[in-house]
């Protein structure tokens, strides 16, 4: 286990999480910000990328597990993401649709912010969010983040405007 909150724990994903990950990444509505659902090969590539991030950085997107049922309901964690000419430490999150609007993403994202500041000793952490993804924007705001920049990213053959949210360690009480 990497992190624990009141209702959740976050741990590294492993191959046995493939089916749970499919419930997220193969769902059209969940993946609208990515221009569509993934297929099995893309889900496997995503999982492999997280596992290699754990080895390279010591962090990545982690499985979010509901304590009450021991079920993986989403993913949330820290990744290094390209933004214009640099790489940013980003809090990312994506949950099964069944668990939307219950505060789980905010709870997990706040724990990741604390981890970034206290364990990784980061001075700032970001969330890069598509301009049409209102629910994720609300999570970022609840995590004390503000928009600092915008940029059009090219992904899956589509130009997508993204906003860059930031929170700085010196601005928050941990």
What does each model-found stretch correspond to?
Residues 1-32, 48, 65-174:
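Acyl-donor (CoA/ACP) binding surface of acyl/acetyltransferases
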